[in-house]
Amino acid sequence: MMSPSIPPADTTDSDLMLVERTVAGDQRAFELLVIKYQRRIERLIGRMVRDVDLVEDIAQETFIRAYRALPQFRGDAQFYTWLYRIAVNTAKK
């Protein structure tokens, strides 16, 4: 999906700050969220779906849906919890 090499300073940004930056138009901020959570999301989906190619497709769709829904993210829950729910719902479809 995206390159896993990121400058160390970027990894200190909080998820909420990265969400806010993404909503404001900073594409790099969303890339950092994807890099941070891509493997966790793929492992989660992999427990639900055994086809490796399908796991990657569902993970990609999860991040697309999350990106589109970011303006509605209120921060009531942790970002990963919100992303987890999107991944599970996407995998069930």
What is the predicted role of each segment?
Residues 34-52, 69:
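Amphipathic, Lys/Arg- and hydrophobic-enriched alpha-helical face
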Residues 57-64, 77-89:
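Structural recognition of an alpha-helix C-terminal capping motif at a helix-to-coil junction
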Residues 23-24, 63-78:
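Sigma70-family region 2
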Residues 1-24, 32-36:
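Intrinsic, short, N-terminal disordered tails of RNA polymerase sigma-factor systems
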Residues 50-51, 72-75, 88:
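Short, conserved catalytic or interaction motifs in soluble domains
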Residues 25-26, 51:
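Acidic/polar helix N-cap motif
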Residues 41, 45, 70, 83, ...:
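Hydrophobic-face residues of short alpha-helical interaction/recognition segments
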